């Protein structure tokens, strides 16, 4: 399925209109069923859908990890993801029903945030990873080079999992949380440890993005944008290093200063 469509538009520039073709991000609703029961519909970018499903179910505590999932069947034509699970968390299973998560998330996702997060995040973030400023600038440069769809459409969020030396996984999605869930799902299925890794994110570091980072077990998050006040406060409580405004040869460290040299 195409992740970008091409639309004829009228652009106003230099005092005149002209008809051009513009690249637009595809928006795709995916309904997840767990053991034949409808759980949620997520509006997403239609790629790496199995990664999204595994990452979402694990990060939201519906399952404990890939070991609880027997199979994931993605039916692209109907927008269905059918999951067969051998274990479902009974507490979080109460969220079953017709939940609809838009690409911008917000209140439509509130049932999946803060109510059960305390038991899902690692409040003892002690990742061994440390980064120098030169490492950060190099990683961000590589991240930007892998952001073709973002630059093409301006309508997606990018996220990456990286070590001090390289980007391991890079995923994009119209939903900022989805991009992180796709990374988490891939890492879980590959057996890749996230505790000694960092997250690179294309957008603002909100409290919800900070919680997602904590659920992944990463001790550092890097972004070209800034964190919110609540995100900084949560980062200090969870011992997560937040680095923002990474542009050119400058950056700001907002929390967890000891990991950046």
UniProtKB/Swiss-Prot annotation:
Protein family per UniProt: Belongs to the FdhD family.
Q: What does this protein do?
A: Required for formate dehydrogenase (FDH) activity. Acts as a sulfur carrier protein that transfers sulfur from IscS to the molybdenum cofactor prior to its insertion into FDH.
Q: What is this protein called?
A: Sulfur carrier protein FdhD
Q: Which residues bind Mo-bis(molybdopterin guanine dinucleotide)?
A: 245-250
Where found in the cell? Cytoplasm
Note whether Transcription regulation occurs among the keywords. no
Q: What are the positions of the active site?
A: 105 (cysteine persulfide intermediate)
GO MF assignments: sulfur carrier activity; sulfurtransferase activity
Which Pfam families did the record assign?
FdhD-NarQ
Q: Which GO terms describe its biological process?
A: Mo-molybdopterin cofactor biosynthetic process
Highest taxon above the source species: Bacteria
Cellular component (GO) terms are:
cytoplasm
Which of UniProt's keywords are assigned here? Cytoplasm, Molybdenum cofactor biosynthesis
The cross-references to InterPro entries, in alphabetical order and at most eight, read:
Cytidine_deaminase-like, FdhD
């Amino acid at each position: 399925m195409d992740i970008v469509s091409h639309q004829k538009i009228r652009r106003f520039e230099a005092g005149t209109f002209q008809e051009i073709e513009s690249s637009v991000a595809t928006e795709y609703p995916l309904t997840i069923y767990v053991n034949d029961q409808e759980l949620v519909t997520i509006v997403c970018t239609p790629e790496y859908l199995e990664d999204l499903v595994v990452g979402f179910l694990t990060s939201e505590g519906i399952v404990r990890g890939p070991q609880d999932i027997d199979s994931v069947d993605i039916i692209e034509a109907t927008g269905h993801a059918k999951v067969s699970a051998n274990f479902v968390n009974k507490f979080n299973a109460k969220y079953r029903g017709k939940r609809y998560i838009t690409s911008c998330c917000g209140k439509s996702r509130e049932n999946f945030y803060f109510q059960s997060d305390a038991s899902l995040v690692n409040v003892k973030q002690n990742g061994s990873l440390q980064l120098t400023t030169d490492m950060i600038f190099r990683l961000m440069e590589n991240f930007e080079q892998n952001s073709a769809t973002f630059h093409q459409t301006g309508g997606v969020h990018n996220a990456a999992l990286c070590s001090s030396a390289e980007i391991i996984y890079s995923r994009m999605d119209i939903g900022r949380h989805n991009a992180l869930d796709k990374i988490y799902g891939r890492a879980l299925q590959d057996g890749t440890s996230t505790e000694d890794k960092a997250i690179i994110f294309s957008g603002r570091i909100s409290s919800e993005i900070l919680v997602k980072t904590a659920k992944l077990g990463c001790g550092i998050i890097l972004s070209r944008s800034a964190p919110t006040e609540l995100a900084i406060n949560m980062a200090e409580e969870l011992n997560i290093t937040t680095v923002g405004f990474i542009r050119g040869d400058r950056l700001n460290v907002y929390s967890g200063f000891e990991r950046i040299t």
